[in-house]
Each structure stands twice: as structure tokens, then as C-alpha cells.
Regions:
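Helical scaffold of the NTase/Pol beta-like nucleotidyltransferase catalytic core
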Residues: 1-37
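Generic non-transmembrane alpha-helical segments
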Residues: 20-28, 64-68, 115-123
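Short secondary-structure junctions
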Residues: 28-37, 63-79, 125-132
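Short, flexible, solvent-exposed loop/turn segments with mixed acidic/basic and small polar residues
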Residues: 36-44, 82-84, 92-94
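Catalytic metal-binding acidic patch
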Residues: 41-62
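Helical (often loop-to-helix) elements that flank the catalytic cores of nucleotide-handling enzymes
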Residues: 55-70, 105-109
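Catalytic cores of NTP-dependent nucleotidyl/adenyl transfer enzymes across multiple folds
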Residues: 83-86, 93-254
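Charge-dense, extended regions
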Residues: 224-339
Length: 339
């Protein structure tokens, strides 16, 4: 919050306020919501996190918050609404229904989700609010962001974590640290801030418990897991074997990208310009006409490009040249008519 001074609460007072906040939210509305799980021995709290299913909320969530809690301030940051109740900050985290179960596990137990996310990243995957995902890239270009699984027990198992132990909760922050380091794929190197980009370093330096974890690693001398050295390609093959739907989606994305790249190689502005001598606005108009004037329109033109073999490109070039001549004839005809 930016203008309202807020306080920290002891665990006892936090739980009393949490009961009041949740009772108010669920008594006066049909919102599906719950407190984000916290560490059992946490002595005091600086804010309260409430996870809510966006589909069960009214269109104007801020108006609902004002009506229910009469806060002095409401700050909206993407899908998080922060507001004050009894001089204490409440963060209402709104997620789509498909992400509710994954988000409730990812957000639980303080910094654990972020720590597990570093192990996932080291393996070539992303672990977050929407479960386990894979980003298909071509260099720095993001080709596709593909779901691997939204079943959290399966995601934990893939990352080398015991989901049953996770569901038993954690008493102290050190228990969370031990758990984060328990994966056979865990590597302490993944957490060193100097190995991160500037934005990541700035972000994580502000997170006290993340810094505590790094100090804990140094103090305990925690070693890498027995399988930490496995390459990303190994984990990708594992994921394709364990999650058939992901394997199918990955294959489709790879094929679509390969098709798109080849289309750009055989049909682009430079090729059309070289064949026709056109440039600027005239070139742009012809490019659009080549798509739209093809029998069946743009989708059929793209399908035709995809089926053309390298030895058949002369047919494409002839089509381009014919369309350029046709466009030129049309332009001259229009000029003569206007004269």
C-alpha cells in the first residue's frame, strides 16, 4: 500500500483478523476463496494473502472490496488487489478457475514456490501459478508456452519433490529450506544471485527469506542432489515420456514453427521485391493481394505454401509475377478511366 500505514500482527491477532476477513468475504458473496497456507511457527505477519477464484467474483472486484471492508486504500497490480483492514494489509489474489488448485500450492508456505521454481528453471521448465510449463524457444524468441501438467502431485514428482510431505505442512522456515533442497535435481548454484540477470538480482535481493535461504545454504554446506548434473535435454525427454499430452502439444508447436519459418524463407517481401521491382506502399499492397486473391483466400494460400517443395518454387514465383502484372494493368486501367 502506498498511502496507508499498516502494522504487523502477532500470529494470534493475525488468525483472529483472518477469520473476520474470510467470514465477511464468504458470508456476503459467493466467492470461492481461502487463506494462502503459512508456516506453522510463524510468529508474526506483515500481510495476509487470500486466494480467490476470479470466475466467482463480480466484474468490479474493487467495488466489492470497498463495499465489504470500507478500506482507506485499494491498490490494483494486475490480478492482485491490496487493501487495508484494521490497519493491516490484505492481498486478494484473483486467478482463473483452471489455476486455482495450482496457485494454492505454488503460493503456499512463504518462499517455497519460488525456491522450487529455481530447480524447475535449472531443469529447463517453469513452475508457477499455473503448474509446470515448458517454454519452447528459438534463441531469444519465445515460440510457445506449453503446459506440461496442472496436476501438482505429478509436477512435484517430476521435479523430485515428495508431494505427500508437502501436504503435511511445515512448522518452521528451516523446514521449508530443507524441503526445497530435498530434490535429487537440486543444485545450490541455481540460487546464487551473481549468476542471475540484473532484474532478477534486484527482485530477489528485496525478498528477505530468499536471502535467508542463500545464507542457509552456505551455513549448512548443502550439496547438490545426486541427479543435479543431468542435462536439460534429459529432462525434456522425461517430460515427453511422462506427459503424453505435453509431448503432442510440443510436437505441434515445433511443426507449426518449422512451417512458419519455411514460409518466411520462400515467401517474403525481399523475394517479392526482387521479382517485381516494387517497393514501399505498392509492395505492401501486392503482398496483401497475393494472400487475399488466392482461391480460398489467405488460409488456402498458407496451406499452398506449406505443401510446395523446393523444386516447385518456380510456380510460386510465376504466381507473384502474374499478380504484379495484373495489379499494374488494373492501376493503368483506373488511371485511363479517370482521365
Amino acid at each position: 500500500l502506498q498511502t496507508v500505514a499498516t502494522q504487523r500482527l502477532t500470529a494470534v491477532n493475525y488468525r483472529l483478523l483472518a477469520t473476520e476477513v474470510m467470514d465477511t468475504l464468504q458470508r456476503d458473496s459467493r466467492v470461492r476463496a481461502e487463506l494462502v497456507r503459512s508456516i506453522g511457527a510463524k510468529a508474526d505477519f506483515g500481510h495476509m494473502k487470500v486466494l480467490a477464484d476470479r470466475s466467482t467474483m463480480p466484474a468490479d472486484v474493487a467495488a466489492m472490496v470497498h463495499r465489504l471492508y470500507s478500506p482507506h486504500e485499494v491498490v490494483i497490480n494486475e490480478d492482485v488487489l491490496s487493501f487495508d483492514v484494521a490497519a493491516f494489509q490484505v492481498d486478494l489474489i484473483c486467478v482463473p478457475p483452471i489455476e486455482y488448485d495450482t496457485a494454492r500450492d505454488y503460493l503456499a508456505f512463504n518462499v517455497l514456490g519460488s525456491l522450487m521454481g529455481r530447480t524447475a528453471n535449472r531443469m529447463g521448465f517453469k513452475y508457477g501459478h499455473s503448474g509446470l510449463r515448458y517454454k519452447l524457444r528459438d534463441g531469444d524468441f519465445l515460440v510457445a508456452d506449453i503446459p506440461v501438467t496442472t496436476k501438482m502431485a505429478a509436477a512435484f514428482d517430476f521435479l523430485g519433490y515428495d508431494y505427500r510431505r508437502f501436504t503435511e505442512s511445515f512448522h518452521a522456515l528451516e523446514d521449508v529450506f530443507f524441503y526445497a533442497a530435498s530434490s535429487t535435481y537440486f543444485d545450490p548454484v541455481a540460487y546464487l544471485l551473481q549468476a542471475r540477470g540484473y532484474r532478477d538480482r534486484a527482485c530477489y535481493q528485496k525478498r528477505q527469506n530468499y536471502r535467508f535461504f542463500i545464507e542457509w545454504l552456505k551455513t549448512t554446506g548443502t550439496a547438490a542432489g545426486s541427479s543435479a548434473g543431468l542435462q536439460r535435454e534429459h529432462h525434456l525427454q522425461r517430460a515427453m515420456s511422462q506427459f503424453p499430452d505435453f509431448a503432442d502439444a510440443l510436437k505441434r508447436s515445433q511443426e507449426a514453427f518449422a512451417g512458419s519459418r519455411r514460409r518466411k524463407q520462400i515467401f517474403n517481401g525481399q523475394i517479392v521485391a526482387e521479382l517485381t521491382g516494387l517497393e514501399g506502399e505498392a509492395l505492401g499492397q501486392l503482398m496483401r493481394r497475393l494472400h487475399d486473391a488466392y482461391p480460398g483466400g489467405r488460409p488456402e494460400f498458407v496451406a499452398w505454401l506449406d505443401q510446395l517443395q523446393d523444386h516447385e518454387l518456380a510456380v510460386l514465383h510465376a504466381y507473384i509475377e502474374d499478380m504484379a502484372i495484373d495489379a499494374s494493368v488494373r492501376t493503368k486501367s483506373l488511371h485511363s478511366t479517370s482521365d
